[in-house]
């Protein structure tokens, strides 16, 4: 399981995930690679140790393609680039939108993936460790569900989007 908090980290995720994973039965716990953000890795690693959960914690991931290739499930925020990457990589996800994002755009992004079966929307305001642990347990006991979510994510990918946008801009510019 890959946990992403962005280059600055997402402190709510850094606190929530160790606590939630501690509530998942040890035999179900996935391997954990947690990108905690600059200056948050040591505290986050200590939270995992205190919770009795093994995790590799780093401040930053230099090779996202490799990290995505390794992951079977991603827990992260729901920024536009992130959800695009999840779709392109065909990865199931649990999305915890930034609650104070402008126009609540991260929730809209997460709702899109969730509605199509590629993600679970886990609102930060209402998702506690027990809620997340229950959802994790549910999907970890049903690997076929993760496979279905991955297929749904792949269907949502728009690998030619840059080309399409350039063509639209050229059409508008040249009338």
Model-identified regions with their sequence ranges:
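Donor-nucleotide binding loops and adjacent catalytic segments primarily
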Residues: 1-76, 107-111, 115, 122-132
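Short Ser/Thr-rich beta->loop micro-motif in glycosyltransferases that lines
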Residues: 59, 77-81, 97-101
């Amino acid at each position: 399981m890959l946990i992403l908090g962005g280059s600055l980290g997402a402190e709510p995720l850094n606190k929530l995930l160790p606590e939630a994973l501690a509530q998942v039965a040890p035999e179900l716990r996935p391997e954990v690679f947690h990108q905690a953000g600059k200056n948050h890795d040591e505290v986050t690693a200590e939270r995992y140790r205190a919770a009795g959960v093994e995790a590799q914690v780093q401040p930053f991931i230099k090779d996202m393609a490799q990290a995505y290739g390794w992951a079977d499930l991603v827990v992260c925020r729901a920024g536009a680039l992130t959800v695009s990457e999840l779709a392109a990589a065909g990865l199931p996800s649990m999305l915890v939108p930034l609650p104070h994002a402008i126009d609540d755009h991260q929730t809209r992004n997460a709702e899109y993936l969730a509605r199509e079966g590629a993600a679970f929307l886990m609102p930060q305001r209402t998702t506690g460790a027990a809620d997340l642990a229950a959802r994790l347990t549910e999907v970890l006991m049903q690997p076929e569900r993760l496979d279905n979510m991955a297929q749904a994510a792949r269907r949502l990918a728009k690998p030619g989007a840059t080309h399409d946008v350039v063509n639209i801009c050229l059409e508008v510019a040249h009338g």
